[in-house]
Amino acid sequence: MSMAVASLRLLARGGRRRARFPAPLSVPGGRAAFLSGAAEEVAQADAPPPPPPGRKVLESFREEFEIGGRVISFETGKMARFANGSVVISMDDTHVLSTVAAAKSSEPVRDFLPLTVDYQEKQYAQGVIPTTYMRREGAPKERELLCGRIIDRPIRPLFPPGFYHEVQVMNATIIMVNVISSDGKQDPDVMAANASSAALMLSDIPWNGPIGVIRVGRIDGNFVLNPTVDELGLSDLNLVYACSRDKTLMIDVQAREITERDLQAGMKLAHAEAVKCINPQLRLAKRAGKKKKEYKISLISDKSYEKIRTLSEAPIEEVFTDSTYGKFERGEALENITQSVKAKLEEECDEDSLKFLHKAVDTVRKQVIRKRIIEKGLRVDGRQLDEVRPLYCESSTYPILHGSALFSRGDTQVLCTVTLGAPGDAQRLDSIVGPPTKRFMLHYSFPPFSINEVAKRGGLNRREVGHGTLAEKALLAVLPPEGEFPYTVRVNSEVMASDGSTSMASVCGGSMALMDAGIPVREHVAGVSVGLVSEVDQTTGDISSYRILTDILGLEDHLGDMDFKIAGTRRGITAIQLDIKPAGIPLDIICESLEPARKARNQILDRMDQEISSARAFNDGSSPRLATLSFSSDSLRKLLFHRKKIEQETGARVSVSDGTVTIVAKTQPIMDKAIEKVEFLVGREIEVGRTYKGVVSSIKEYGAFVEFNGGQQGLLHISELSHDKVSKVSDVVSVGQVLSLTCIGQDLRGNIKLSLKATLPHAHEKKDLASNHTDPLPSQEVVGWTAVENMPSKDANAEPSISKDEDNMIEETPGCSTPAVIIRSAAECDAQDVTNDPKKKRPKVAKSSPKLSKPASERQEVKRTSAKKTSGASTTAKKNKKEKADSSNDVLDAIPEQNKSNIMNYSSPSNFRSGSMKLGDVVTAKVYQIRAYGLVLELSDGVRGMHKFAENGHKDFEVGEELLVKCSSFNAKGIPVFSLLD
């Protein structure tokens, strides 16, 4: 029996091994196939023993509910069991862990609530290794700070008054990868806020929750609950709403000019759906929650408060009644009152009252200002409840910048600047949801001098990040799409002076700066802050009376109940942020606040339109230039390794993305230089029949290889060099020479075939050029072989001056601003190189083939000088000479009579010889070669002349191009030197 049991155990273990490591052939039924008879006894023996008495068993609790067709669950007891409270919330494949911990000391350590909310998105959540040097998680990102604010703002008002113990809420986003994996559709910020509420409910920390948080979108006029990231891209509303069962706690909105009525409908729907998150938290807290711990509440006694109120109420009311006080004068007067009360308490040695002095005086200030506003409708600066402070707008504050504006509202002043950059300057976002880059940024800065304080500047500040993001959301709705305006835009908002509502002032200043930069925004965006002062019925806890304040001061923000920031255009709202101090405000009051905000916003927009109402011209000197070039993906590979080099050489910014190259430069010359380098490096798609510029890279017996179109090689066969027969390639072209060539196809091997003669006119085309022009020509403008006005010299007696540079023979001719230079032919240049460099071998000149046919002009010259010419040949030569003379006379007859008097020494190309040309003769020549320093010009009868480029002269010539030139001098060999005529 024991052997049978041992065999069964062995087989059972083998079954377990097969279950863990499946083999191609497995026993059907696995281990269950052997559990019969004695096997059942073995199974009972192998079962895990029951836990010893007193040992805790891991137990988890779970609550599920549904919102918008998606199932959401709260789970506790499985993870982070040592924390004061921990909850894992799940929706689809997104899971968020929220933990809560409080300081162990029962004594308060501060006179305010030291609440800290840390939100983290670990890179492992999306299956990515961090890109930092140490491959660890880096400092908190902007998105993490913003999500932390989303959690902090609704839960902070629900802590009991006087609870000043340190509390920390930790949120770590965890996306668990299973066989399906996560698609990253859900933004976890709303889930984290709900999980934090549930964790606080489970903990022993006193907190008057729970809350419900929900996101609402709108697509094609229909509201969507908890939309995905893709749905938010189609939505014109992104509303994050937090509430208790009957009051609103937090609102955060980004919209595309939604109307006040539609926004109210969205908030009412959000409230009804967010309440569904509350009951599951209550059920979970009832099953697994801890008993609330008794903490010592830091509250002043009624006796001490009455004593301080009696000493300070009258002088405080006197200060608030005087509307002539400014921010700092009022603050100094209130501080003097506090010091006076402190001196009296010190005389009486009232230590209990001194301990809560500042808190009690602040409470007295709040009661005085509330009573004055509610009963009399008067504010501390003398304004009416719906009155906006004086406005000041100024655009183009610093014209050298791309865009700048200065905006002031009362004592609040903000300087906004705009900087435009290339698409590659866009901010790269390393978040688990959302787009990978952001092309529009608004950075808000609150320096200490704006409130006349001394402080150290640290890293990212949550307040600065939050205010900058709010203003960025407000302006994003009016920006042109990326296809119309591909620039990266950065707005920098510097607070110069602060007395309330600096974020809304940043919206106004940023809108004017965008227009000043020439960005085609549709219209202005303005923002204003709305406040609330209310009285609460102590018996019911409801608000009995209230007043809505428009454009609140910093003091009214501090002593009031609400800071409701609303930004938008005349069409509707683009951004909203609501922060409150009491434990919730009814939604009806919030909806009522939208109307006074709309009126104030339109008033501010009117003043902004008076300063600048539309975008300025974008082509001024301060605006950068942008060009977009399209290439194939294969061609762009050449640019990836040379992009940085082009940027260093030109100073332009080059961005490569999806077959498109975007170049941004400060000036047009820099832009042209960068485009030239990019096109030369990448090249264009080669088309048969299209003309390209190329550089001769090597010369062979059968032709020349030319580099063109971004480094591509083409063959210029010897038969494509000229319409006439060529015996040697080097007689026509040389290495390094720039040519204009036409693509004529490919050979059997796939090599690109180029042609030079396709760009040159035939002999009969050149002959008939003059006879085709019959229209009268304007003064100083010549087409073809027509003469031009000879520009006289300023000094008729001036002698030609010759440079001391005998090698280059640079000559200057009177009456011509461009210096004329003797430029030798290719053979002469080679001979000169050998003379200058004795080590260089003289190139061997091959004898001409006896079968080489000479040009027609040379053949005519031979016939005129040979004693053996026939009578038929003589007749033909005379006939050709007569036709050329008649064509020149026809051209001269086509010139108006008033211009003929200005023509001097015109020589027809068929009437002159190299020995008969005179200084001042005006002729039409053809570009024969293009050198780095000048042109080799071809005249008739085999005569060639030269022209040198000026230092900054025009160098855009093509081989075969006809130019109008004037003979300015001759060199020692009798070669004519020409200067160009405009």
Curated annotation (Swiss-Prot):
PROSITE patterns given in the database record: S1
Main subcellular location: mitochondrion
Top-rank taxon: Eukaryota
Domain spans labelled KH: 624-678
Compositional bias (Low complexity): 846-855, 868-877
GO CC terms, sorted: cytosol; mitochondrion
UniProt domain S1 motif: residue ranges: 689-757, 920-982
Region (Disordered): 792-814, 832-892
InterPro entries membership: ExoRNase_PH_dom1 (IPR001247), ExoRNase_PH_dom2 (IPR015847), ExoRNase_PH_dom2_sf (IPR036345), NA-bd_OB-fold (IPR012340), PNPase (IPR012162), PNPase/RNase_PH_dom_sf (IPR027408), PNPase_PH_RNA-bd_bac/org-type (IPR015848), PNPase_PH_RNA-bd_sf (IPR036456)
Gene3D superfamilies reported for this sequence: GHMP Kinase, N-terminal domain, Nucleic acid-binding proteins
Subcellular location: Mitochondrion
UniProt entry tagged with the keyword Iron: no
Catalytic activity as recorded in UniProt: RNA(n+1) + phosphate = RNA(n) + a ribonucleoside 5'-diphosphate
GO MF term list: 3'-5'-RNA exonuclease activity; polyribonucleotide nucleotidyltransferase activity; RNA binding
Pfam families per record: PNPase, RNase_PH, RNase_PH_C, S1
Gene Ontology biological-process annotations: mitochondrial mRNA catabolic process; mitochondrial RNA 3'-end processing; mRNA processing; rRNA processing; tRNA processing
Organelle targeting peptide span: 1-39
CDD domains found in the cross-reference section: RNase_PH_PNPase_1 (cd11363), RNase_PH_PNPase_2 (cd11364)
Record's keyword terms, sorted: Exonuclease, Hydrolase, Mitochondrion, mRNA processing, Nuclease, Nucleotidyltransferase, Repeat, RNA-binding, rRNA processing, Transferase, Transit peptide, tRNA processing
UniProt cross-references to PANTHER family, sorted A to Z: POLYRIBONUCLEOTIDE NUCLEOTIDYLTRANSFERASE, POLYRIBONUCLEOTIDE NUCLEOTIDYLTRANSFERASE 2, MITOCHONDRIAL
NCBIfam families: polynuc_phos (TIGR03591), PRK11824.1 (NF008805)
Family, per entry: Belongs to the polyribonucleotide nucleotidyltransferase family.
Its biological purpose: Involved in the 3'-end maturation of mitochondrial mRNAs, rRNAs and tRNAs. Functions as a poly(A) mRNA 3'-5' degrading phosphorylase.
Record-given protein name: Polyribonucleotide nucleotidyltransferase 2, mitochondrial
Organism expressing this protein natively: Oryza sativa subsp. japonica
Lineage of producing organism: Eukaryota, Viridiplantae, Streptophyta, Embryophyta, Tracheophyta
